[in-house]
Swiss-Prot record:
PANTHER family xrefs: PROLIFERATING CELL NUCLEAR ANTIGEN (PTHR11352:SF0)
Name of the protein described by the UniProt record: Proliferating cell nuclear antigen
Main location: nucleus
GO molecular function, one term: DNA polymerase processivity factor activity
Protein keywords: DNA replication, DNA-binding, Nucleus
GO cellular component terms, semicolon-separated: PCNA complex
Binding region for DNA: 61-80
Cysteine pairings via disulfide bonds: none
Native source species: Catharanthus roseus
InterPro entries according to UniProt: DNA_clamp_sf (IPR046938), Pr_cel_nuc_antig (IPR000730), Pr_cel_nuc_antig_C (IPR022649), Pr_cel_nuc_antig_CS (IPR022659), Pr_cel_nuc_antig_N (IPR022648)
Pfam families noted in UniProt: PCNA_C (PF02747), PCNA_N (PF00705)
Length: 268
């Protein structure tokens, strides 16, 4: 028996909105530690890892460790039927080929339940090694989203460079070029508005903006984003989910010579 009750139901809606355009089908894994997902996009250039810790749920029951295959667009459609203030409960019996979403209004005067068929999805769980990164940038998530959106109106790729001067986002296209520099700024009144740069050595990498713009759909989940860069590793774009966990996006850099994305090469 699986039963997960989330008082802040809007959080699950936001999670699905941030995933559904990147990944079509995925397995949600349930264990004593939490509700998680790991999946690659169809081109094997981007990977997403999600964790919602068990203690963040009002009620969390997971008798076995089921893996539930779901179509994320279908799941998002069901969750759109929930009000933003609704309490969302996920239920599945052991061995069942369906999952039930129950939505309760805060005043308990309306209860809806939607049943969705599960899928059999073959997916390898990839081992993502812990790594030391050359540079880590923490900045307001809305600012990062704005930069990616603005640059994508000029070019298709962005060069992210971190030096002692700050972090620079650059692009070029048919109509011209654009450069945006963000310097370290820790003196702001609100910590959420700070930009913090930790650099062990300078780094400069090129990425496809269409993927970064997809990642920024997670902006409503967190006020801040952490971007971890290293010359021989995929970039990690992480949004912390308050008191619950995180959503991390991994993106392979483009190879300068032929301007093609590398495939992610984590071990299954």
């Amino acid at each position: 028996m699986l039963e997960l009750r989330l008082v802040q139901g809007s959080l699950l809606k936001k999670v699905l909105e941030s995933l559904k355009d990147l990944v079509t089908d995925a397995n949600f894994d349930c264990s004593a530690s939490g509700f998680s997902l790991q999946a690659m996009d169809s081109s094997h250039v981007a990977l997403v890892a999600l964790l919602l810790r068990s203690e963040g749920f009002e009620h969390y029951r997971c008798d076995r460790n089921p893996s539930m295959g779901m179509n994320l667009n279908n799941m998002a459609k069901m969750l759109k039927c929930a009000g933003n203030d609704d309490i969302i409960t996920l239920k599945a019996d052991d061995g069942s080929d369906t999952v039930t979403f129950m939505f309760e209004s805060p005043t308990q005067d309306k209860i809806s339940d939607f049943e969705m068929k599960l899928m059999d999805i073959d997916s390898e769980h990839l081992g993502i090694p812990e790594a030391e990164y050359h540079a880590i940038v923490r900045m307001p998530s809305a600012e990062f989203a704005r930069i990616c959106k603005d640059l994508s109106s000029i070019g298709d790729t962005v060069v992210i460079s971190v030096t002692k001067e700050g972090v620079k986002f650059s692009t070029r296209g048919d109509i011209g070029t654009a450069n945006i520099v963000c310097r370290q700024n820790t003196t702001v009144d609100k910590p959420d508005e700070a930009t913090i740069i930790e650099m062990n050595e300078p780094v400069s990498l090129t990425f496809a903006l269409r993927y970064l713009n997809s990642f920024t759909k997670a902006t409503p989940l967190s006020n801040n984003v952490t971007i971890s860069l290293s010359s021989e590793l995929p970039v990690v774009v992480e949004y912390k989910i308050a008191e619950m966990g995180y959503i991390r996006f991994y993106l392979a850099p483009k190879i300068e010579e032929d301007d093609e994305e590398q495939s992610l090469e984590y071990q299954a």
